[in-house]
UniProtKB/Swiss-Prot annotation:
Superkingdom classification of source: Bacteria
General function of this protein: Required for maturation of 30S ribosomal subunits.
Keywords of the record: Cytoplasm, Ribosome biogenesis
Lineage: Bacteria, Bacillati, Bacillota, Bacilli, Bacillales
One Pfam family from the record: RimP_N
Matches recorded under Gene3D superfamilies: Ribosome maturation factor RimP, C-terminal domain, RimP-like superfamily, N-terminal
Compartment(s) of residence: Cytoplasm
Family statement drawn from the similarity comment of this UniProt entry: Belongs to the RimP family.
Record-linked InterPro entries: Ribosome_maturation_RimP (IPR003728), RimP_C (IPR028998), RimP_C_sf (IPR036847), RimP_N (IPR028989), RimP_N_sf (IPR035956)
GO cellular component: cytosol
Protein name: Ribosome maturation factor RimP
Length: 157
């Protein structure tokens, strides 16, 4: 059910975002405790502000009321993805080159399944990350199809 809902919401929100020069980052439809939440994460090259989130929320809410794909009460939340934005699509990896990332893989690569470091390259099939290995830095090449999840990482000094 949640996959079906997110697909419908994606179809509804995409034209709204295109009209506002915004992009869809992610959609979550989850139950937390007794409540259901429909979360839509949006962004643009210049970031998003609360007014844009509010406008998208209003327009999407109208569309959801028309189509009514969710049979029970839920909370609609529209927001930016935040500082640790998920990297979901190939273009997200390309835009993140030069930034710090955190990547989990489906299976170990060089004995590890988690990597944190600077994303230095992405060619569509391989994600290259420079990570610290004890006292030195080394580059790890991760096949894109082995990436289970990835996000920007905030590094505190």
């Amino acid at each position: 059910m949640s996959k079906k809902v997110t697909n419908i919401v994606e179809e509804l929100v995409t034209p709204i975002l295109a009209d506002m020069d915004l992009e869809l980052v992610d959609i979550e439809y989850v139950k937390e405790g007794k409540n259901w939440f429909l979360r839509v994460f949006i962004d643009s090259d210049n970031g998003v502000d609360i007014e844009q989130c509010g406008m998208v929320s209003e327009k999407l809410s109208e569309k959801l009321d028309e189509v009514d794909p969710i049979p029970h009460n839920y909370f609609l939340e529209v927001s930016s993805p935040g500082a640790e934005r998920p990297l979901k699509k190939p273009k997200d990896f390309t835009k993140a080159i030069g930034k710090n990332v955190y990547i989990k893989t489906y299976e170990p690569i060089e004995g590890e399944k988690e990597f944190e470091g600077e994303l230095i390259g992405f060619d569509g099939t391989t994600v290259s990350v420079t990570v610290k290995d004890k006292t030195r830095k080394k580059t790890i090449d991760i096949p894109y199809e082995k990436v289970a999840s990835a996000r920007l990482a905030v590094i505190f000094f």
